[in-house]
């Protein structure tokens, strides 16, 4: 297993190292996720990851003296998920290279931003029946499970009564998970609502993280805002990060991220550069993640 911070430290080239460091600076989720770096980039025609998801855990019981312990068996689901190649390519004219050398940096920054946006959108709403080249996200994994909740509180006109009712729903929702989650993933609009609820209830908590970002929290749990349309609903996703819970998947050997600059020595006026991130996600236990869906419109 590996984090992107460890991948950056071990990267052979400064270009990849800098690119990955920029990603983890700008994306808490990508910096916090642990990746199972277990897949080979050669010797296979597809990138798939098979694992066991614990749907119902084992149950321990007391036994009487001189009796055998009662047997317990977990309910396990075998899951096969796809690992995807998330990429962005760009063209640059050789004249522009000489006239505007900062275009290199601009293209790399935009590639980094594009990869973060697409990863954030897919980690929630990814569905390989819609995009066969992507990977399945959290929404698909938790739909219809014991951690799939729907709110009954109307948050359009906030007052103390609705704020308290929402807080009770959040307590019920979070208590259904295997432990306190590491992060709540929300849309910008829902983050505004949660911040307003926290102010009404007098539990507002805003700090600064190590990257200099302002961080809001709900009862000590980080609230991460997924911008640029990555999450279009007011649903709240909670995730317990780790290899026993929700984690990423990528290639082994430090090959998760690649960055290629144009070859200006080759013939041709227009050259191509690209950046790629091989990624997927796995939910090892049903209770390692959940969703509190917004109240349906009436």
Roles of regions detected by a PLM:
Residues 2-89, 131:
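Assembly/oligomerization interface modules of large self-assembling protein complexes
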Residues 2-36, 43-45, 101-102, 135-165, ...:
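Sequence/fold signature of self-assembling virion shell proteins
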Residues 46-54, 72-143, 175-193, 260-281:
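Long, contiguous amphipathic alpha-helices that act as assembly "spine/axial" helices in icosahedral shell
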Residues 167-172:
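Phosphate-interacting basic helix/loop segments used at nucleotide- and nucleic-acid interfaces
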Residues 173-174, 224:
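A generic local secondary-structure boundary/capping motif
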């Amino acid at each position: 297993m590996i984090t992107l911070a460890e991948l950056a430290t071990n990267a052979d080239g400064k270009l990849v190292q800098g690119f990955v460091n920029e990603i983890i600076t700008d994306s808490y989720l990508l910096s916090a996720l642990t990746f199972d770096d277990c897949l080979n980039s050669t010797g296979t025609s597809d990138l798939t990851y098979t694992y066991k998801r614990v749907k119902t855990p084992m149950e321990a019981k007391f036994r009487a003296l001189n009796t055998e312990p009662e047997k317990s068996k977990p309910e396990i689901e075998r899951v096969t998920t796809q690992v995807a190649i998330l990429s962005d390519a760009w063209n640059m004219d050789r004249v522009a290279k000489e006239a505007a050398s900062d275009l290199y940096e601009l293209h790399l920054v935009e590639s980094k931003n594009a990869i973060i946006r697409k990863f954030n959108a897919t980690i929630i709403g990814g569905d390989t029946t819609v995009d066969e080249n992507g990977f399945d996200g959290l929404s698909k994994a938790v739909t219809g499970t014991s951690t799939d909740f729907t709110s009954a509180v109307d948050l359009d006109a906030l007052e103390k009564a609705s704020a308290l009712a929402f807080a009770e729903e959040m307590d019920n929702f979070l208590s259904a998970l295997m432990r306190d989650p590491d992060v709540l993933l929300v849309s910008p609009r829902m983050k505004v609502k949660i911040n307003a609820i926290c102010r009404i209830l007098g539990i507002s908590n805003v700090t600064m993280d190590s990257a200099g970002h302002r961080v809001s929290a709900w009862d000590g749990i980080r609230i991460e805002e997924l911008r640029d349309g990555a999450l279009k609903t007011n649903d709240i996703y909670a995730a317990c990060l780790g290899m026993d819970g929700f984690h990423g998947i990528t290639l082994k050997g430090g090959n998760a991220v690649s960055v290629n600059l144009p070859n200006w020595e080759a013939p041709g006026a227009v050259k191509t550069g690209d950046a790629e991130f091989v990624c997927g996600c796995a939910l090892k236990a049903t209770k390692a993640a959940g969703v509190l869906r917004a109240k349906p419109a009436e």
